[in-house]
Amino acid sequence: MKKVVFESVGNVLLFVLMGLAFMFPFSPYEGGATADGFSLSVHLSPLMAVFVVFLVLYPIARAVFVRRSGLHASTRDNLELAADDERELQITGRALRTAYRVLMTCLIVGLGVLAAAQFLSATFLGDAVAVYRTAVGIIAATLVAASASYCIRWCLEYRK
């Protein structure tokens, strides 16, 4: 169960950071360094910097977790989908069905919200960035909801 929770929490963090980094890429942090004959200027969103750091650190943390857990070679690639026995295979199937239902529901609702955001933006705001942020937020929220529902269902089924 630890492997599913670890992977799901990592995925949720990844999707949240990715969503925030891509929702607000236009809020740059400007910094610079100069030396004799050398100049460096950085224009980067702080959220994008956190996302990039997470992309570097998460695989390292995952490798350490896999090594310390003593998982088999067959389960290293897909921790949340790996099954050690028939019971875990059935649990994974039920959790995947739940995640699929949540994913489809969120996508249908998200399309409606996106259409409403497009209409409101075109009618009242005239701001294309608001529609972009809404779309990225919907995609990130959908991925978070699917990952969280998979983890919750998997843990509930495992404890039965």
Task: Describe these PLM feature segments.
Residues 19-23, 45, 98-121:
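Alpha-helical transmembrane segments and their membrane-interface junctions
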Residues 2-10, 24, 121-160:
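Alpha-helical transmembrane segments and their immediate juxtamembrane interface regions
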Residues 1-57, 130-137:
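Long, highly hydrophobic alpha-helical transmembrane signal-anchor segments
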Residues 13, 50-53, 57, 102, ...:
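Lipid-exposed faces of alpha-helical membrane segments in multi-pass integral membrane proteins
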Residues 57-77:
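Membrane-water interface of transmembrane alpha-helices
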Residues 28, 32, 67-68, 119-124, ...:
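Membrane-interface elements of multi-pass transporters and channels
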Residues 78-96:
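Short membrane-interface loop/juxtamembrane segments of multi-pass integral membrane proteins
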Residues 23-26, 61-65, 113, 153-157:
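Membrane-water interface at transmembrane helix exits
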